[in-house]
Amino acid sequence: MRYENLLVEIGTEELPPKALGKLAQAFADNLQGALDTAELKYTSIKWFASPRRLAVNVIGLAEQQEDKLIEKKGPAVSVAFDESGQATKAAQGWARSNGITVEQAERLTTDKGEWLLFKGEAKGEQVSSLLPAMIDGALKKLPIPKAMRWGSSSIQFIRPVHTVTMLFGADVIEGNILGIDSDRVINGHRFHGEKQFSLSHADDYLAQLEAHYVLADFSARKDKIRHQVNAAAQKEDAVADMNEDLLDEVTALVEWPVALTASFDDSFLEVPKEALIYTMKDDQKYFPLIDQNGQLKSRFVFVTNIESKDPMQIISGNEKVIRPRLADAEFFFNTDKKTTLESRLESLKTVLFQKQLGTLYEKSQRISELAGTIANMLSSDISQASRAGLLSKTDLMTNMVMEFPDVQGVMGMHYAKHDGEHDKVALALNEQYMPRFAGDQLPTSNISCAVAIADKIDTLVGIFGIGQVPKGDKDPFALRRAAIGVLRISVEMKLPLDLTTLVQASINSFGTKLTHVEDLESQVIDFILGRFRAWYQDQHIDIDVIQAVAARRPTKPADFAARIEAVSAFKSLASGLALASANKRVANILAKNKVTDTNSINSSLFESEHEAALADAMSDIEETVNAFVVDANYQGVFTELATLHDKVDAFFDNVMVMAEDENVRNNRLALLSKLRTLFLLVADISILNQQQ
């Protein structure tokens, strides 16, 4: 069997930069799936991508499928031949479909009878005959939201295709992909070197392209850009503002990266740096430079796609491009400052939050009220929280935010400071949107937390209250993110907030706007608590631990988290799973036998020392356990409950719960009910998996 490396490249016009990596990965994944389905052996597979190409490299691909021995069971002998011993039409048809006569068929004998059997060998197909259809199928499965046609062809793809290269080692695999016949021709850089060249061998792909000013390896190109930008920043005694999303996008825009440094007028630094950074990063794909004091410098790094003989001309061109954008930001900032945030409240009446839920003005009123309620729960300044909630959406009406939507919140903070608002009020206007994404920072003050939670709860209650519950991947109001935000802030900031109180207060604030109020409180709370599952699974918390706590439905997120920590620790104890098993047994017994009064334990009905021992042990720890529950010291609760291990084991080993005497039986059930009640103070540990 011959093994070679396969190179497949689809040469296109410039591909969408934000989608490039996903497209290339999907291309490789789809082709890998096709190879696996066809049972073609290979060692590994990787992808390459640049603005004008998607490529897949399969290492150690077999030249053909392995031959297979096949067996096909035919009709039973009893129906394959008639009374005279002649083959029936059913037998003849089956034999013909397998390319044999009935006489050539073998026999398969089992304890259930005898059947005709065909044994043969299926020759493996050549990779050259299989690949074109595989590649065509892999491309058709790409996640392309909107395809396009070009020329007079009806063929569609994300961008027009110019070349298709399929090399198995040094051999061209013939085929027609997306209307283009395969060849060994590769497009080089658009401006440097030869426009096209011929690739002699699949193994030469990266080196040949690099010789023609194309770094086809996305990861290598990204690393080079990172290194160049960091080196340029160091020369300026600064650090580049460089996140992975921007780095990926710039990597997808260039084939031969060259980092250069440019500047803008210092006067623009009077504008809040967030607006300038947004303009540079999001609009122009530049890397802003931050000095050692965390301040924005009037210098930036950009990455060009050519190695120019006159880099100053390119630098000058980029400086001319950024200047009017920064001038716009400066104009918006200076214009916006002439109008206070408070005076923009009226304009919020013209903007709908949601048709049934009213305007942003109404939403800000609700946020203000709920933020004040939360601040009161946190023993924080109610007036500051209410004020921040009231002004929370006013910056949406400023020129700056209308032009650069991503600076909402942070511009509200700057404008609030200019207006003379309290520092905590101004800070809350920025931090109200935190956390914006997974792993994002949280609000830093109680006032900010109050506004952030109020905003999220208002959205959750409102959207649920009009029946627009998220379904599948559809979540247009980002309710899942809002729920996770409420949980993260409450848990990580250790806030003593009860979702029941918050949700009910929010429901009341909507008046008659909500149309789906039946069980609304429970629906919203269950939805929020349901986000705990994914959150804790990401932290590698066992699912049964999460279920054990969720079964008790604690509605204080910080309290929920404390219980999770305690149950996880309890499960790791030697006695933990044993007591969990005993609790499961107790739960099963009590499910079949209702106990009306757990306080009716009568020691005079004890017939065994083990009953008395368990009763005494529970009495000894009951007061301490209840005190620990009040203090939310759930690990302390389990430490006390763990002391019951031996007593519980001895009880079940020596006592028959379902005694014939009804009074004795009910007394023992009451004893078990009390045991169960003690454990349920924290979680339903009967759910814990005994196999882990």
From Swiss-Prot:
EC nos: 6.1.1.14
Cysteine disulfide partners in this protein: none
Reactions catalysed: tRNA(Gly) + glycine + ATP = glycyl-tRNA(Gly) + AMP + diphosphate
Keyword Iron-sulfur: no
Record GO biological process: arginyl-tRNA aminoacylation; glycyl-tRNA aminoacylation
Main location: cytoplasm
A single Gene Ontology CC term: cytosol
Superkingdom: Bacteria
Location relative to the cell: Cytoplasm
Entries under Pfam families matching the protein: DALR_1, tRNA_synt_2f
Record keywords, A-Z: Aminoacyl-tRNA synthetase, ATP-binding, Cytoplasm, Ligase, Nucleotide-binding, Protein biosynthesis
Single annotated GO MF: glycine-tRNA ligase activity
Quaternary structure, from the entry: Tetramer of two alpha and two beta subunits.
The family this protein is said to belong to: Belongs to the class-II aminoacyl-tRNA synthetase family.
Record NCBIfam families: glyS (TIGR00211)
Protein name as annotated: Glycine--tRNA ligase beta subunit
Gene assigned in the entry: glyS
